[in-house]
């Protein structure tokens, strides 16, 4: 018997075992689910150090260097945090029928319903000072409707159980577990979780941590490549699919590949007749609002923007890809120079993700003026800046293709004043740049508080058609908080999925969301642990993970000590 035949039989067995437990999962009551969450939290706490160390080895990072902190942060910390968000939400479902919304529920002048969802706990206020998050609902949702849009699956007693295939992302190791947990506890699905080949070495650790679900037959974890993924996508016992990847991957799943796939897409004839959701790529903009910035402001925001690029060696769908500036702003050149300085001071990283060298070469061949920074080894790429890309350029690779490596472009828009610039910048982001996943808007406090300019900034926040709009810091916060929905702006279709269809995380279980809006201070304190020059990030992020595993006032001093040594 061939190896592929054995593998196929294992995949079929996993699908059959899950299908047999679909209805049983539907019958698991909320108290049992809370108990499962507690078991999962203990399981992920046990594997946290091994998980972080394994990914650091893949990425070639020294565990004793500050940059190692990011793998604690975007790995076990985020999953433990999300489990706590889910637990609180389920307690709300048990006690009142729906998760408790921690902040006020308001309406915008146009009637759109907005729910303040963060901070939720005392720990949120201590660890994320100055950070506030809202969920903006679909315009048709009213205040009276809102409660009915939460936790619908916990009130639907008629729908049959279903199996969801989760195709995990290969770039951020927490994506797969987070998506699996979303599908289990928010959508009421049993889950067949296939790891991406890049991080399939984590399968034994995830099986250990998620054993409470596996032992009860509600989760199966499998590995394999494209052939195994295709087999599962077409499997008759798989009812729906959620994928993290590129738009091309989504289209291949739904319509197939080659000429036949292109023809099916054009004719609207999908290859598979099952729902496919996904979080796909994005050319993520950083929209800079002109202001009277000091040299310290420029240095801070340069580090802020560079940190959005170099995290995970640039292999993030939410990495900074296009910096948008006002052509007439006196600080434009100074900000670019500060970005250059920070890139030059940042050690290059292993380009571990498949295709990185080819993508980088494609961009620099299109832009020979690209500026390279660092002294990369043979398995590394230089940090790369392409400044001054004409904003009206047609078929511009920097605007239409996600680089997915350590490369960022900059463009400038002509406008007579800040208000006009913001209108142009919003239209440019919405209509020219590929994708609708996330955008960061950087504005200093004085500008934001100016009566006329502040209104223009708020109009920009409202008009940006992105699933996450973050003011002043990396929009990846929307991925990390867990309580906010993460996904593309609604409206994409299977034949043109853009940055994706549907949302994940979304711990408060809203069904009718338009976007998340996150607001932070222009300059944060304490210094953000994801900043590239944080001097104790590896210690701090390990302590944060320990704290998230077992929160207590007794553990707080150790976190504070490392936070203040940034």
Question: Which positions does each model-derived feature cover?
Answer:
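N-terminal Rossmann-like NAD(P)+-binding subdomain of aldehyde/semialdehyde dehydrogenases
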Residues: 1-150, 196-200, 209-214, 557, ...
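C-terminal core of ALDH-fold dehydrogenases
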Residues: 35, 378, 422-535
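Short loop-to-beta-strand entry elements in the cores of soluble alpha/beta enzymes
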Residues: 37, 187-198, 218, 272-291, ...
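Active-site-adjacent "gating/activation" loops or surface patches in catalytic cores
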Residues: 130-174, 178, 185
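PLP-dependent aminotransferase-like
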Residues: 142, 163, 175-227
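Conserved NAD(P)+-binding/catalytic subdomain of aldehyde/semialdehyde dehydrogenases
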Residues: 163, 212-322, 327, 491-493
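Terminal end segments
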Residues: 197, 206, 536-566
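NAD(P)-dependent aldehyde/semialdehyde dehydrogenase
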Residues: 291, 311, 317, 325-437, ...
């Amino acid at each position: 018997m061939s190896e592929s035949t054995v593998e196929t039989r294992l995949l079929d067995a996993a699908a059959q075992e899950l299908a047999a437990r679909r209805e049983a999962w539907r019958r698991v009551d909320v108290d049992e689910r809370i108990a499962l969450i507690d078991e999962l939290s203990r399981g992920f706490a046990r594997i946290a150090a091994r998980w972080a160390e394994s990914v650091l080895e893949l990425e070639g990072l020294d565990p004793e260097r500050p940059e190692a902190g990011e793998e604690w942060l975007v790995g076990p910390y985020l999953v433990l945090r999300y489990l706590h968000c889910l637990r609180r939400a389920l307690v709300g479902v048990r006690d009142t029928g729906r998760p408790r919304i921690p902040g006020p529920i308001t309406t915008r002048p146009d009637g759109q319903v907005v729910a303040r969802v963060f901070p939720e706990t005392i720990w949120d206020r201590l660890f994320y000072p100055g950070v506030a998050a809202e969920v903006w609902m679909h315009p048709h949702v009213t205040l009276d409707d809102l409660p009915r849009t939460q936790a619908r699956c916990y009130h639907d007693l008629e729908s049959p159980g279903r199996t969801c295939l989760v195709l995990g992302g290969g770039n951020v190791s927490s994506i797969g577990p987070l998506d699996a947990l979303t599908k289990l506890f928010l959508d009421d699905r049993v889950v067949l979780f296939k790891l991406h080949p890049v991080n399939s070495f984590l399968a034994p650790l995830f099986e250990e941590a998620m054993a409470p679900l596996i032992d009860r037959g509600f989760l199966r974890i499998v590995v394999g490549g494209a052939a195994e993924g295709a087999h599962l996508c077409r499997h008759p016992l798989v009812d729906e699919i959620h994928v993290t990847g590129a738009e091309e991957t989504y289209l291949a799943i739904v319509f197939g590949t080659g000429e036949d796939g292109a023809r099916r897409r054009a004719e609207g004839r999908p290859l598979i007749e099952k729902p496919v959701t996904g979080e796909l790529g994005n050319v993520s903009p950083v929209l800079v609002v002109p202001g009277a910035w000091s040299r310290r402001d420029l240095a801070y925001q340069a580090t802020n923007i560079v940190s959005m690029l170099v995290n995970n060696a640039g292999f993030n769908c939410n990495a900074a890809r296009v910096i948008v500036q006002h052509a007439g702003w006196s600080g434009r050149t100074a900000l670019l120079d500060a970005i250059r300085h920070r890139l030059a001071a940042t050690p290059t990283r292993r380009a571990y993700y498949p295709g990185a060298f080819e993508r980088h070469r494609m961009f620099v061949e299109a832009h020979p003026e690209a500026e390279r920074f660092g002294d990369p080894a043979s398995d590394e790429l230089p940090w790369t800046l392409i400044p001054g890309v004409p904003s009206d350029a047609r078929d511009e690779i920097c605007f239409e293709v996600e680089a997915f490596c350590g490369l960022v472009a900059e463009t400038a828009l002509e406008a007579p004043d800040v208000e006009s610039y913001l209108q142009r910048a919003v239209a440019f982001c919405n209509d020219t740049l590929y994708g609708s996943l996330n955008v960061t808007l950087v504005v200093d406090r004085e500008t934001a508080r100016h009566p006329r300019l502040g209104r223009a900034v708020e109009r920009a926040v409202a008009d940006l058609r992105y699933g996450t709009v973050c003011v002043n810091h990396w929009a990846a916060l929307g991925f990390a908080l867990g309580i906010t929905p993460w996904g593309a702006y609604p409206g994409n279709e299977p034949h043109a999925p853009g940055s994706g269809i549907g949302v994940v995380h979304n711990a408060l279980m809203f069904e009718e969301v338009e976007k998340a809006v996150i607001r932070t201070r222009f300059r944060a304190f304490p210094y953000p642990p994801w900043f590239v020059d944080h001097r104790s990030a590896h210690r701090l992020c390990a302590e944060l993970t320990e704290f998230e595993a077992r929160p207590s006032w007794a553990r707080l001093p150790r976190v504070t000590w490392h936070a203040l040594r940034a």
